[in-house]
């Protein structure tokens, strides 16, 4: 089924894995009072948002399909935090947007790999590159223990798995805000380390912050629809 074909259906997203490869997303539809199963093109997200730097993966959200980064934004293969101005420049360039707490929770509940958070001591060094490079190496060690290959090329391929738990998310806030909004860092129990907070100024970031761009639209009932906060 192509993205241009109109079908009216209630989407139930199932991510099917075969030898480690994502095969398809299934949409159960009711058209002309007939139940049927339609197969979405695997590249539906990546065809819609071709500027993405990572292979977008589907997440079920509000009875539709949302497209999300499988991991946090990286620069030179390092998960890299940044101030709010640069964050908005990034998502605008990609044609994407920041998630909301609701999206963060949906991603966590559907993740392929959930990592235990690794808080580091809250020192004056926590905003330095050396600190978040160190944190990144700890995350990579966790992924290696899980059996997930430490290969940056995977994030650009259909073999990418949805990973969560390893960072607080920078979440959507008004562009004119003087604060940055953060949320998440779920423990394996599902408990949050970081409730929604705007305590920091807009250009603050530290090693614990992650930027995960998501699509501004959901694919629902055969159409792309803008979702609101």
Language model feature labels by segment:
Residues 12, 21, 29-85, 112-113, ...:
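Short, compositionally biased
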Residues 17-25:
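Bacterial N-terminal signal peptides
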Residues 84-154, 213:
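Conserved hydrophobic ligand-interaction patch in extracellular adhesion modules
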Residues 26-27, 102:
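Alpha-helix/helix-capping structural signal
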Residues 133-216, 223-227:
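Intrinsically disordered, low-complexity, charge-dense segments enriched in Lys/Arg
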Residues 1-13:
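N-terminal secretory signal peptides that target proteins for export/translocation
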């Amino acid at each position: 089924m192509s993205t241009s074909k109109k079908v009216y259906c209630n989407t139930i997203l199932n991510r099917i894995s075969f030898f480690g490869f994502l095969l398809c997303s299934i949409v159960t539809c009711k058209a002309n009072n007939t139940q049927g199963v339609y197969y979405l093109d695997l590249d539906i997200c990546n065809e819609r948002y071709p500027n993405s730097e990572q292979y977008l993966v589907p997440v079920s959200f509000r009875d539709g399909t949302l497209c999300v980064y499988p991991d946090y934004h990286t620069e030179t293969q390092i998960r890299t935090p940044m101030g709010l101005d640069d964050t908005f420049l990034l998502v605008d360039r990609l044609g994407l947007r920041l998630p909301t707490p609701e999206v963060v929770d949906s991603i966590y509940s559907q993740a392929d790999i959930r990592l235990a958070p690794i808080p580091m001591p809250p020192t004056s060094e926590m905003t330095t590159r050396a600190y978040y490079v160190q944190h990144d190496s700890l995350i990579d060690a966790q992924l290696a223990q899980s059996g997930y290959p430490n290969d940056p090329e995977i994030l650009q391929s259909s073999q990418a798995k949805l990973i969560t738990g390893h960072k607080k998310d920078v979440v959507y806030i008004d562009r004119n805000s003087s604060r940055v909004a953060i949320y998440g860092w779920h423990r394996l129990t599902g408990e949050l380390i970081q409730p929604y907070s705007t305590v920091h100024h807009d250009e603050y970031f530290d090693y614990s912050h992650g930027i995960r761009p998501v699509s501004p639209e959901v694919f629902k009932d055969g159409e792309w629809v803008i979702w609101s906060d």
